[in-house]
């Protein structure tokens, strides 16, 4: 009955206008990864859904039957932040954010088949998440993470003393990172244990900080680190975690170590791959990730890059023996793909890894002792893999994924066999009705140096005999890609269903097409990538008759925003009716204001003061480029974007206004490099789509398309005339 109510609630938000609207997009249910029980019969996953009428996002937890794909409601308690399996039949352990300890969380035990019979095992005195558990004798050892104080205690924001001043004082970097000014607290992995008495478990509230004894270490590493940054051995006795190299400047270098430490913290954690260490392969000193123990706990597999200041270098699989002085082994090191996650099969003989390949996140397998020349085998599945877990002790895995046409794909994949579909959101959610793979196709075009891939995304009800304006979307990174995956921010299908055909290119600098294409953007931001885009645009103009390039638009965020600004000052800028630049750099020298200096120092071949000419080479604000500007442009920049200052967007808008070019500035004071809050996201879509629809002519040809006037936010306009009216 509860499941039926959930579906009925979804029906209430289905749009009666365009096929796939921003409201549909934002309010469609969002599902987390599905985690199977030890026997491989059920999986639990988180689900939430935004309600525009009530302005809230209720959430809960569902169960997925791994035999038939049926879904049932486990709980609708929005205070439960995570659930995992206890390892004992269908028993589960979960974290509840509402606790008797102010600012703390509760650890609860229940059964997936009788959730209402839950009991509290104990409290944690602070925010705590990322539980991983393993039986150790008569106890269940666990690890998780929270913030640490300088003394090594779990930080509790609610219990912290209020500072007498708002001053911040720094003697080293980072000052701020992503969206936050760095404070004295830092992330740390903590260990604890559940003790069994009778048929119940209890937790005494005692945690051991495993990271604090290593001065300047931090794990998980912000801003995006999580439970994938550490692991617990199957016997519960040993923990592995990754941290930036404590002895090196974190804002300038990406060097990361994998540390090993006893679960009880009886010894200080030690790195197994220290730079220039006796076990570390020669010249390997880049970022490490994804540490995971073998089933017997004797080996650790992890991923590592070679270059010490390059966050987009190729990752290679490494295997280290625990408690040994033997050199770390590199596995399939010649494979020209960059794996993202690695896991062991239950017998410890096979590795399963995910890696981006030709704009799709794929699952691969390879022997744990593979030679350097070995090429991993693809496991068949649909869409891109977000996460995967083994189904019981079998070779099959439960994949949680998505695609350009569905925001959730639950499927079982087995090496050498067809995949087995369990649940695809586009076949169930009314908001996603009509979405499917038939409206997506790849495009390959000769670029500046090699063939370049793009996605073509067509609107619902596409008719090849009609003509649709071009929406030319440029991805960020620049070392990133438009993949066959669902985005909760820039979603090509939302743009297409306004009445466009979207072309989403993967030019020089993109990932998943071999490391050379990724590396070739170094110190060439406005070179080969721009030429690739010109060639793709020309191919579309000359060979795809159902795309109208005369009334097309171009838009991009981050590096894509830079590229839109670059295009505005070049010939390609005159080919579009409108431009949209979201969080893009404008003044070349302003890049020194970023947070992660290793990024710019790699991409521009040196520091700001030693290689200044490289920063200035790709300066969109050069007078000779600004002189060419004329295309209407929407500029978006947010106050908590510490990747590049909001002043970049304001400066760009200043110049557009002084030149008398139709332009608008959109700012969210509470958003970061991304726009993630539902109501802000709706305004963002209303402004962006309204802007391009106005200039492309879509508003005239499609009366149901979004208009700028659809946005309820009042526009600030205090000038009767532009500067050049005088």
Swiss-Prot record:
Entry's localization field: Secreted
Keywords associated with the record: Aminopeptidase, Glycoprotein, Hydrolase, Protease, Secreted, Serine protease, Signal, Virulence
Signal sequence span is 1-19
Keyword check for Flavoprotein = no
Q: Cystine bridges: which residues?
A: none
What Pfam families does this protein map onto?
PD40, Peptidase_S9
Q: What is its EC number?
A: 3.4.14.-
Give me the Gene Ontology terms describing cellular component.
Answer: extracellular region
Any one of the GO BP annotations:
proteolysis
Single GO MF annotation:
aminopeptidase activity
| Database matches in Gene3D superfamilies | alpha/beta hydrolase (3.40.50.1820), TolB, C-terminal domain (2.120.10.30)
Is the Cell inner membrane keyword given for this protein? no
Q: Where is this region: Disordered?
A: 269-291
Role, per record? Extracellular dipeptidyl-peptidase which removes N-terminal dipeptides sequentially from polypeptides having unsubstituted N-termini. Contributes to pathogenicity.
Task: Provide the family line.
Answer: Belongs to the peptidase S9C family.
* The protein, known as: Dipeptidyl-peptidase 5
Q: Give the species this sequence originates from.
A: Trichophyton equinum (Horse ringworm fungus)
Q: Which gene encodes it?
A: DPP5
């Amino acid at each position: 009955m509860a499941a039926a109510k959930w579906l009925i609630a979804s029906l209430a938000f289905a749009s009666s206008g365009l096929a796939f609207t921003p409201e549909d997009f934002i309010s469609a249910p969002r599902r987390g990864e599905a985690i199977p029980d030890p026997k491989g019969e059920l999986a639990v996953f988180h689900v939430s859904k935004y309600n525009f009428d009530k302005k809230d996002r209720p959430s809960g937890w569902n169960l997925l039957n791994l035999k038939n794909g049926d879904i049932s409601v486990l709980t609708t308690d929005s205070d439960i932040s995570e659930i995992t399996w206890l390892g004992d039949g269908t028993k589960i352990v979960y974290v509840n954010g509402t606790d008797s300890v102010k600012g703390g969380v509760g650890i609860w035990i229940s059964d997936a088949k009788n959730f209402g019979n839950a009991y509290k095992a104990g409290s944690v005195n602070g925010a705590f998440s990322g539980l991983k558990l393993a039986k150790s004798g008569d106890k269940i050892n666990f690890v998780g993470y929270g913030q640490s104080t300088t003394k090594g205690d779990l930080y509790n924001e609610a219990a912290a003393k209020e500072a007498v001043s708002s001053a911040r004082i720094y003697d080293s970097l980072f000052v701020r990172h992503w969206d936050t000014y760095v404070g004295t607290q830092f992330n740390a992995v903590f260990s604890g244990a559940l003790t069994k008495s009778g048929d119940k478990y209890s937790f005494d509230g005692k945690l051991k900080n495993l990271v604090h004894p290593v001065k300047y270490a931090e794990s998980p590493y912000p801003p995006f680190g999580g439970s994938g940054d550490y692991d617990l051995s199957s016997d519960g006795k040993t923990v592995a975690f990754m941290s930036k190299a404590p002895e090196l400047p974190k804002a300038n270098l990406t060097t990361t170590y994998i540390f090993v430490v006893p679960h009880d913290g009886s010894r200080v954690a030690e790195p197994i791959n220290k730079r220039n260490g006796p076990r570390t392969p020669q010249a390997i000193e880049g970022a490490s990730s994804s540490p995971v123990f073998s089933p017997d706990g004797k080996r650790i597999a992890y991923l590592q890059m070679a270059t010490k200041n390059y966050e987009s270098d190729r990752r290679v699989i490494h295997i280290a023996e625990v408690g040994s002085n033997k050199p770390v082994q590199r596995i399939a090191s010649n494979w020209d793909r960059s794996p993202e996650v690695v896991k062991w099969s239950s017998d410890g003989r096979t590795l399963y890894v995910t890696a981006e390949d030709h704009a799709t996140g794929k699952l691969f397998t390879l022997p744990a002792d593979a030679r350097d020349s070995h090429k991993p085998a693809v496991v068949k599945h649909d869409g891109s893999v977000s996460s995967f877990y083994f189904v019981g002790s079998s070779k099959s895995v439960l994949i949680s994924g998505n695609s350009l046409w569905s925001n959730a794909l639950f499927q079982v994949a087995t090496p050498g066999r067809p995949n087995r579909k369990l649940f695809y959101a586009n076949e169930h959610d009314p908001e996603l009705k009509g979405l499917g793979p038939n409206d997506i196709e790849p495009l390959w075009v000769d670029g500046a140096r090699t063939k370049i891939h793009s996605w073509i995304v067509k609107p619902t009800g596409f008719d090849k005999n009609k003509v649709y304006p071009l929406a030319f979307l440029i991805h960020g990174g620049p070392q990133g890609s438009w993949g066959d995956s669902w985005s909760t921010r820039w979603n090509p299908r939302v743009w297409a269903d306004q009445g466009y055909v979207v072309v989403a290119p993967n030019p020089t600098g993109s990932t998943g097409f071999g490391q050379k294409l990724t590396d070739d953007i170094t110190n060439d931001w406005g070179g080969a990538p721009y030429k690739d885009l010109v060639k793709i645009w020309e191919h579309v103009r000359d060979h795809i008759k159902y795309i109208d390039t005369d009334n097309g638009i171009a838009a991009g965020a981050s590096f894509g925003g830079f590229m839109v600004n670059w295009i505005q000052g070049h010939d390609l800028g005159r080919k579009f009716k409108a431009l949209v630049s979201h969080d893009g750099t404008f003044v070349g020298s302003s890049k020194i204001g970023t947070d992660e200096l290793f990024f710019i120092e790699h991409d521009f071949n040196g520091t700001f003061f030693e290689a200044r000419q490289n920063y200035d080479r790709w300066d969109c604000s050069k007078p000779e480029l600004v002189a060419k500007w004329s295309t209407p442009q929407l500029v978006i920049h947010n106050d908590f974007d510490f990747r590049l200052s909001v002043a970049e967007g304001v400066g760009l808008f200043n110049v557009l206004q002084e030149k008398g070019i139709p332009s608008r500035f959109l700012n969210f004071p509470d958003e970061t490099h991304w726009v993630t809050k539902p109501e802000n996201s709706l305004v963002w879509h209303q402004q962006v789509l309204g802007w391009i629809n106005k200039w492309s002519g879509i508003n005239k040809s499609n009366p149901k398309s979004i208009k700028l006037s659809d946005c309820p936010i009042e526009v600030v306009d205090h000038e009767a005339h532009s500067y050049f009216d005088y």
